[in-house]
């Protein structure tokens, strides 16, 4: 169960309005709306304790469980020339150790990363970031197209390299990186494959 579900369930069972619920918890109405809209789940310890008393449950456990659910945001091309699809396909629950390594999953289409053991329909777990070290596998936005590639920096060039010899590497100058634009949007932390 997520925090917003817990709050709305309590609100309903006690016949409270959003305003009354916010007052009961001791927060502003705008903060309460952020909580029930899922925009804010990082709560101060004092608020977690207050919520636990009001709701008569262990809110900290609910928040830990919620933090372990990671969305599958759509598809990314292991190749070039595919629009980034931002539809939420579902959620995957991760163990506590893995949950903190990243932010979301993307489903891979294409075969350009098979040399790195990333195959069609695999799920890559991505840590949202704007920079990666040379040699890392990253999600890269080229204009409005997302791709997964190894990223290298050499002699003022950004090189996007497939790990399948049938695909050529792409080389971009700093000017092209700014003009196109080309942006790193995430670091691939690990691959998940379902055998169903």
Which residues does each predicted region cover?
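Recognition helix of helix-turn-helix/homeodomain-like DNA-binding domains
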Residues: 26-43, 64
